């Protein structure tokens, strides 16, 4: 009896090894996450490690740490002032609530003359402006409270969940174009706006994964079509005639 040897065409999966390799290839650990209707973490991944957005926030602040000096204002607490600052002479913490024991200034950022004028060399504003309805007023107040030559280091969410305490006052998401227009109207040309993140980073962040659970090589990829957050480095003019 003549034996016949089966010839496997290039690219065809052998019947003796049906699709197991393909299943492993196309069913990564992400698939169960993508089938969920609720995230793995309800607090942006804080209970699993550092949230994915913090990876980008800390990279941005590290890149501009030379500006975190002199008299520094930060919102909520002074963690980034302490971690990235050098030559910090005075540190203030801004909060809208007097219940925050770390707050040294209790004020609404969107109110005119809420903050001391020309007081700060650096203002660290991390993931805050989405909670301020009157953005134009807030940016004017930020500009007013900086010293001439003072620097704003700001991060803005492009993709994020709404926190359980913020359903009533989470107003905005940002793109580089919207951030550029918002800050250019007040700071003029002395702004640098960038976006960071990609599809994988956005998916992981919304799913509640921590940054430690995602490959840093992939987190480093920036896709302008899938920004996770927007960063703004804005300098107040040293000229007293500047807006």
Question: How would you name each of these model-derived features?
Answer:
Residues 48, 163-182:
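Acceptor-substrate binding/catalytic loop of class I
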Residues 67-80:
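Conserved class I S-adenosyl-L-methionine
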Residues 4, 10, 63, 89, ...:
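A C-terminal cap/extension of S-adenosyl-L-methionine-dependent methyltransferases
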Residues 107-123:
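A short acidic, Gly/Pro-enriched loop at the edge of an enzyme's catalytic core
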Residues 136-151:
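A short glycine-rich, Lys/Arg-flanked "PGG" loop and its adjoining helix->strand segment in the class I
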Residues 154-156:
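Acidic carboxylate diad motif detector
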Residues 121-134:
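A short SAM/SAH-binding and catalytic strip from SAM-dependent methyltransferases
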Residues 16-66:
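Class I SAM-dependent methyltransferase Rossmann-like catalytic core
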């Amino acid at each position: 009896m003549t034996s016949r040897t089966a010839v496997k065409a290039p690219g065809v999966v052998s019947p003796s090894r049906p699709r197991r390799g393909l299943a492993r290839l196309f069913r990564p650990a992400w698939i169960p996450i993508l089938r969920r209707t609720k995230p793995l973490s309800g607090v942006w991944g804080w209970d699993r490690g550092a949230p994915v957005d913090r990876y980008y926030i800390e990279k941005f602040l590290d890149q501009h740490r030379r500006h975190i000096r002199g008299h520094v204002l930060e919102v909520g607490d002074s963690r980034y002032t302490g971690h990235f600052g050098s030559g910090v002479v005075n540190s203030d913490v801004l909060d809208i609530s007097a219940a925050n024991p770390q707050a040294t200034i209790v004020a609404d950022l969107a109110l005119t003359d809420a903050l001391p004028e020309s007081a700060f060399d650096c203002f660290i504003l991390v993931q805050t402006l989405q909670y301020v309805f009157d953005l134009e007023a807030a940016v004017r107040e930020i500009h007013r409270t900086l010293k001439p030559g003072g620097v704003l280091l700001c991060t803005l969410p492009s993709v994020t969940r709404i926190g359980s305490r913020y359903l009533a006052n989470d107003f905005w998401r940002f793109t580089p174009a919207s951030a550029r227009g918002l800050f250019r109207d007040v700071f003029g040309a002395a702004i640098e706006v960038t976006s960071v993140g990609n599809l994988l980073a956005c998916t992981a962040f919304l799913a509640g994964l921590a940054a430690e659970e995602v490959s840093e090589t992939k987190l480093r990829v920036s896709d302008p079509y899938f920004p996770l957050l927007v960063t703004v480095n804005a300098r107040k003019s040293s000229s007293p005639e500047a807006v």
